[in-house]
UniProtKB/Swiss-Prot annotation:
The lineage of its organism: Bacteria, Pseudomonadati, Thermodesulfobacteriota, Syntrophia, Syntrophales. This is Holo-[acyl-carrier-protein] synthase. It comes from Syntrophus aciditrophicus (strain SB). It catalyses: apo-[ACP] + CoA = holo-[ACP] + adenosine 3',5'-bisphosphate + H(+). GO terms for biological process: fatty acid biosynthetic process. Transfers the 4'-phosphopantetheine moiety from coenzyme A to a Ser of acyl-carrier-protein. The gene is acpS.
Length: 128
């Protein structure tokens, strides 16, 4: 049973300007060390940071929440499985809320164009 869906778009240029202005202080506040390492190794890191930021926002929206509503962004980590597909690893408050709501599966999809990155999150579980 679907428990929630979330979608978000991030303007890549806008995020790149934030990265240039705040540098590591922004990155360390929003992304895990593994996410920072992954994105930093890419030819265009801002695209990958933007997609991951969109996934974090999409996850929050799928819960009916937003930034600043109790789940730190670092509790939502975007990684890739062995086939390269994106997956969300959840920690702390994010995991606690999923367990409380009976959510057992989190689906995430990422995409980007030259100017925008987007993500969709779908939450599934057994309970109503």
């Amino acid at each position: 049973m679907v428990h929630g869906t979330g979608i978000d778009l991030v303007d890549i240029d806008r995020l790149e300007k934030i990265l240039m202005k705040w540098d590591m202080s922004f990155l360390k506040k929003v992304f895990s060390p593994a996410e920072i390492e992954y994105c930093a190794k890419r030819a265009f890191p801002a695209i990958h940071y933007a997609a991951r930021f969109a996934a974090k926002e999409s996850f929050l929206k799928s819960l009916g929440m937003g930034i600043g509503m109790g789940i730190p962004l670092k509790d939502i980590e975007v990684r890739n499985d062995p086939l390269g597909r994106p997956v969300l690893n959840l920690y702390g408050k994010a995991l606690e809320i999923l367990e409380k709501r009976g959510i057992t599966t989190v689906h995430v999809s990422l995409s980007h164009s030259r100017s925008q990155a987007g993500a969709v999150v779908i939450l599934e579980g057994l309970k109503d």
